[in-house]
């Protein structure tokens, strides 16, 4: 009788071991990339060096990165500087920027800007940032190689702000055939209409920012004037539950909106108000 019990125990242990080996282990190594935009007038003469940083090197992100990282436990964060001079933006010159800011202060009624906000695309400036983003993407691939991280195990999520949007597209171009992509969070993209990509590469694509050029928009004086907001190309085709545009809530206090405040991350507290179940809320999933 004891021999039969022992045989049964050994049989079960053997089969459980084999069954355990048959269950595929998740070997995915996930990385969350933060890409900042222009760092302000004091840095206007500078251009990115395309280096990888393991911490926010300039304090650009305030509490935004901390909030996002809490929803991505165990994920490795890396940072790239997408800063470029104003001449690569839709403003083209600091004078144009100042003029737009001045006249926007008097637009308390009109919701559509024909000339006050600098909305004319700057394709050359945008492409320069894309090109530098490609260099950064190659640098990230080198980082993976140096740390013996198999590319078929890598999954990348991206968070970009302002000028960082163009830079992120360049990084995507450099890596799209080599790694997987998860979520793409686009915060107040600058020159957003210039280029898009095939968003099917991503699990989710969300664009956050000010609303403009429709009946539900705020008056011009409360809109994002640093990067007048339009949809990134193709986001309207992303499934409703997987992406789209998320606007500053219409109930958000006017004192917290404006040419600068509707763009700057220091005033992005409304982003933290997006709760589980709300459209645009995100967290680590597959």
Where are these regions (language model features)?
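N-terminal secretory signal peptides that target proteins for export/translocation
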Residues: 1-2
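Serine-dependent carboxylesterase/thioesterase catalytic core
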Residues: 30-32, 36-39, 122-224
């Amino acid at each position: 009788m004891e021999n039969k019990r022992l045989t049964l125990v050994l049989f079960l242990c053997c089969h459980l071991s084999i069954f355990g080996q048959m269950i595929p282990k998740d070997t995915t190594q996930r990385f969350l990339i933060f890409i900042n935009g222009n760092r302000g007038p004091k840095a206007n003469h500078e251009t990115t060096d395309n280096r990888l940083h393991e911490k926010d090197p300039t304090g650009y992100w305030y509490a935004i990165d901390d909030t996002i990282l809490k929803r991505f436990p165990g994920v490795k964060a890396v940072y790239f500087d997408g800063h470029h001079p104003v001449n690569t933006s839709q403003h083209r010159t600091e004078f144009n920027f100042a003029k737009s800011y001045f006249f926007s202060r008097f637009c308390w009624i009109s919701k559509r800007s024909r000339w006050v906000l600098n909305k004319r695309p700057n394709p050359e400036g945008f492409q320069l940032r894309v090109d530098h983003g490609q260099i950064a993407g190659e640098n990230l691939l080198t980082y993976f190689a140096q740390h013996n991280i198999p590319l078929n195990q890598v999954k990348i999520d991206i968070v970009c702000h302002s000028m960082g949007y163009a830079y992120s597209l360049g990084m995507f171009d450099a890596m799209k055939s080599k790694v997987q992509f998860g979520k793409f969070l686009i915060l107040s993209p600058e020159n957003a209409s210039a280029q898009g990509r095939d968003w099917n590469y991503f699990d989710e694509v969300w664009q956050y920012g000010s609303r403009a050029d429709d009946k539900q928009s705020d008056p011009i004086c409360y809109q994002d004037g640093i990067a007048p907001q339009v949809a990134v190309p193709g986001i309207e085709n992303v499934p409703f539950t997987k992406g789209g545009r998320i606007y500053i809530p219409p109930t958000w206090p006017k004192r917290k909106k404006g040419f600068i405040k509707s763009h700057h991350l220091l005033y992005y507290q409304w982003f933290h108000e997006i709760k589980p179940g709300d459209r645009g809320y995100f967290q680590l999933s597959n």
